[in-house]
């Protein structure tokens, strides 16, 4: 489990196709202290994707990326030199500065517009329609692994505002109009839907439409 508070930005120095999956090598900055903090078998969130370290050096780690992960995430688009937001799993003593992030990408979004707002920037991101019901105004969403606040929503997109600090600590140089990004919705929204509706969803992508509404939440004592 992660918090979406990015610890460092690494660089994808190698991505090698292996069957339908891939093998990757990620270079890390000295401040990340890879060899000291990462052990073989540990998980490292890389642009929001949970990767298991297979080898670790002073300034790098390697990982195998499964065929499903390649298919379901932006790793299918990545090339050598791609910058990656990195975060190690939280512990019981970790300050939860963001929100609960699992490192399990729910879908791929696309940056539709970037516009300045003083020193900040507004970013509109389109999302797969099946995720819209989990994205709420002033709620949290993980974008490329970073816990960010939703400031506006439409039927198929949402707006983020990145303050100067966020632009500095994230792999913000990746974010351009048309760029694909990994999205993970707040897992609490998914659990709430299941608890309130008592509804079994299909395990595939063709989930039923949600009946979750403001009235349903009130009737079940959540509001």
Task: Give the ranges of each region predicted by the language model.
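Conserved loop->alpha-helix
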Residues: 1-223
């Amino acid at each position: 489990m992660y918090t979406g508070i990015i610890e460092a930005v690494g660089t994808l120095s190698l991505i090698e196709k292996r069957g339908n999956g891939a093998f990757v090598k990620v270079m890390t900055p000295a401040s990340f202290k890879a060899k000291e903090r990462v052990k073989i078998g540990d998980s490292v969130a890389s642009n929001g994707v949970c990767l298991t370290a297979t080898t670790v050096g002073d300034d790098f780690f390697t990982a195998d990326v499964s065929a499903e992960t390649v298919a379901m995430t932006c790793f299918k688009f990545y090339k050598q030199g791609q910058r990656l937001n990195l975060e190690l799993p939280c512990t019981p003593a970790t300050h939860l500065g963001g929100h609960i992030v699992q490192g399990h990408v729910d879908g791929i979004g696309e940056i539709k517009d970037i516009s300045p707002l003083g020193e900040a920037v507004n970013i509109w991101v389109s999302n797969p329609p099946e995720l819209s019901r989990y994205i709420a105004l002033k709620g949290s969403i993980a974008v490329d692994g970073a816990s960010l606040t939703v400031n506006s929503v439409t039927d198929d997109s949402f707006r983020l505002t990145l303050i100067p600090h966020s632009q500095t600590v994230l792999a913000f140089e990746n974010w351009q109009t048309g760029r694909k990004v990994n999205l993970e919705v707040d897992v609490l929204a998914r659990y709430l839907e299941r608890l309130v509706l008592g509804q079994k969803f299909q395990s595939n992508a063709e989930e039923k439409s949600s009946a979750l509404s403001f009235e349903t939440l009130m009737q079940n004592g959540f509001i």
